[in-house]
Amino acid sequence: MTLLKNDTFLRALLKQPVEYTPIWMMRQAGRYLPEYKATRAKAGSFLDLCKNTELATEVTIQPLERFDLDAAILFSDILTVPDAMGLGLYFAEGEGPKFKRAMQHEADIAKLHVPDMEKLQYVFDAVTSIRKALDGRVPLIGFSGSPFTLACYMVEGGGSKEFRTIKTMMYSRPDLLHKILDTNAQAVTAYLNAQIDAGAQAVQIFDTWGGVLSDAAFKEFSLKYIRQIVAGLKRESEGRRVPVIVFAKGGGLWLESMAQIGADALGLDWTCNIGEARRRVGNQVALQGNFDPSALFGTPESIRAEVARILADYGHGSGHVFNLGHGINQHADPEHAKILVDTVHELSRQYHGG
């Protein structure tokens, strides 16, 4: 086991004392980096990049070479799980992800089952390879989509603006949706545990579309299944706690409920005030966020001011991991991302220690 040279991220997630607020960025390995685009071109396609251990390792490490980040996140996609279930994932140019076989008929849903984790071996190989390449520099985060977010793509057959198909199923045949969600929850639990076995030192569950649901529907069709996953995860590996982060975009309404599902931290999108969020969840969980990704289009001065505001809103003490409130925009200037990272480190020290 390689000793971690920088474990600030893990300590902050567990609300242990830190010297500064750690930062990583959702989608930190991505299209805003010219070096990522070059590696992606070499791979041929996005899926080929995910499935090539060497290149997935390369793009995971790229942002760490450029910025002083406190964590790396596995380069992969949330839709690897339904792809392994046999839904036939493909990416249409300019249209995003699509599935050849959408889950819309009772007969198909009845046949849906947890995939053999061997079909996802390329992901676990990437985790092992990235850990080796990191050599203890910073922790590695593994991740998965939430059962509901995965179901959105599986039922709609791709991305959607209004989620009419899945919401029709939810209100007219909730039994079918529950079958999909339960299968997804079992699959995600096995998938994240296999990532932890391969070397992931923290895991994040992305509930990207939970925020489109009503209050009652969120609790029944999303939160219930995230809780099921959290209860089934390995929480210790290599002699350390493996923290679990739950990020629901648009989930600010449900922070109190989310704080009670057993996760170590909650991710916040940019619409929440982090100080209010801290008061609402009390001492139950750490918080991650929540810089508006669009604020990177501002000036260096405005970026610094926004960082200062978020740090001041959170206030003194540990339990805050700085991040964006959603993935970094592909048009963001890497120089502005560097200003963000360096400013967080510089301005946060006054809120720790002493």
Curated annotation (Swiss-Prot):
PROSITE patterns linked to this entry: UROD_1, UROD_2
Annotated pathway: Porphyrin-containing compound metabolism; protoporphyrin-IX biosynthesis; coproporphyrinogen-III from 5-aminolevulinate: step 4/4
GO biological process: protoporphyrinogen IX biosynthetic process from glutamate
UniProtKB keywords: Cytoplasm, Decarboxylase, Lyase, Porphyrin biosynthesis
GO cellular-component term (any): cytosol
Catalytic activity: uroporphyrinogen III + 4 H(+) = coproporphyrinogen III + 4 CO2
Cited InterPro entries: UROD/MetE-like_sf (IPR038071), Uroporphyrinogen_deCO2ase_HemE (IPR006361), Uroporphyrinogen_deCOase (IPR000257)
Entry's localization field: Cytoplasm
Main location: cytoplasm
Coiled-coil stretches noted in the UniProt entry, renumbered to this chain: none
Site (Transition state stabilizer): 77
Transmembrane intervals: none
EC class: lyase
GO MF annotation, one: uroporphyrinogen decarboxylase activity
Keyword check for Lyase: yes
EC number: 4.1.1.37
Oligomer status and interactors: Homodimer.
Family indicated by similarity: Belongs to the uroporphyrinogen decarboxylase family.
Protein role: Catalyzes the decarboxylation of four acetate groups of uroporphyrinogen-III to yield coproporphyrinogen-III.
NCBIfam families: hemE
Entry protein name: Uroporphyrinogen decarboxylase
Source species: Neisseria meningitidis serogroup C / serotype 2a (strain ATCC 700532 / DSM 15464 / FAM18)
Lineage of producing organism: Bacteria, Pseudomonadati, Pseudomonadota, Betaproteobacteria, Neisseriales
